[in-house]
């Protein structure tokens, strides 16, 4: 009788271990089953991070909120940026505004556009994902290659607009134009 109780207990322990292994494995399997981050969400996250490593000229310094204007972008991109609304950047809430191609950019600290920059936007961080965006006057281009988003920073355009990037950011990017002395 003692032997039977031990045998039953061994089966219970074995079953419990199997159940425990299944419970431990299930979250991993679910995480693997979830889709990867979408390209628009990744680009929005990169722009959000860029804002943390950017310094605006004194006259354009955000006082209350930091305004990110998304100009003439596809709906998926607008939704990805709207998800960032109210998040804090440099101690200020981020305010996302979706604008048309001809809308006024007054009050925008960051301008994201999916088309090459058609006009100069002094004192603002312009970011885009159009081919050659940074080469044609934008401050930061987001290039997609081999399923990766790469940064291209136009230091000359940024310097002429009074926008400064941290040296940490510049180390992660392909730099176009002259690198400022002192690495900053």
Language-model-derived ranges and their functions:
Residues 2-184:
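Short hydrophobic alpha-helices and adjacent helix-cap/hinge residues
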């Amino acid at each position: 009788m003692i032997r039977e109780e031990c045998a039953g207990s061994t089966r219970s322990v074995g079953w419990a271990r199997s159940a425990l292994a299944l419970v431990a494995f299930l979250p991993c399997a679910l995480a693997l089953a979830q889709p990867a981050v979408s390209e628009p969400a990744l680009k929005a996250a990169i722009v959000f991070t860029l804002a943390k490593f950017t310094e605006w000229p004194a006259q354009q310094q955000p006082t209350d909120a930091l305004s990110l204007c998304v100009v003439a972008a596809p709906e998926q991109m607008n939704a990805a940026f709207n998800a960032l609304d109210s998040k804090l950047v440099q101690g200020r809430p981020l305010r996302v505004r979706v604008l048309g191609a001809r809308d006024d950019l007054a009050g925008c600290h960051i301008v994201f556009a999916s088309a090459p920059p058609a006009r100069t936007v002094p004192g603002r961080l312009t970011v885009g994902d159009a081919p050659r965006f940074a080469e044609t006057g934008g401050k930061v281009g987001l290039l997609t290659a081999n399923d990766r988003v790469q940064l291209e920073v136009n230091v000359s355009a940024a310097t002429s607009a009074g926008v400064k990037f941290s040296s940490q950011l510049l180390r992660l990017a392909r730099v176009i134009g002259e690198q400022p002395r002192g690495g900053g």
